Amino acid sequence: MTGSTIPGVAYGSVERHADERGSFRELWRRSRLPEPFVQANLSTSAEGVLRGLHLHRRQVDYWVVAGGHAFVALVDVRRLLDGSEPRPVVETRGLGPDDSVTIPVGVAHGFLAIEPLELLYLVTNEFDGSDELGFAWDDPAVGVPWPSVTVTADGRPILSDRDRSNPPLAELVARLRG
C-alpha cells in the first residue's frame, strides 16, 4: 500500500498470478487490511460513465479495479465539516487493472470510466440509504479536473439521475452541520 495526501487513503495493487490456464488474484486479506468488511459489490460501467461524488459518514470503502481503467477523484471533506478548513482537499489518480484504493469515512469519492470498467468494492456497512450522501461532481468550488469523454457529443460524462441532481458541496455541508 502506498500513501496519499489525504490521511487514511491508501493505494495498492493486488498480485496477479497468471499462466496458460488463466490467472488468480487475491483481492483482500484481513491481515493486510483489517477493516470489518460486511458486503462485497461489483459495479460495471460503460466508457464515459461517471459515478459520484459520493460520501459516507459510517462506511469505509475498499476498491479493486477488476478490469478497465478509471479516473478516480477523492475529496476529503472532514476538516471542512468540522470547520477547521475552508476548502476540501482534492486528489485524483488513474487506476487500472488490479489497482486498489482504501477510502476512509468522510472522504467523498467518484470515478470516471475511461474504458469499460469492472470495479469490485468491499464496504464496512450493509447498504444504508441514510448514509448515501453526495454532492455535484462538477461543483466549481471543489474543482475536480475531470477529463472530457469522447462517447458523448458534448464531452460530458454519462450520469445517473441521482448524480445529476446532487447539490453543491456547500449545500451538503450546511445540511450536515445542521
Map each language-model feature to its residues:
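Non-catalytic, conserved peripheral segments adjacent to functional cores
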Residues: M1-P97, E118-Y121, N125-S130, F135-G178
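Conserved metal-binding segment of the jelly-roll/cupin
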Residues: G94-E115
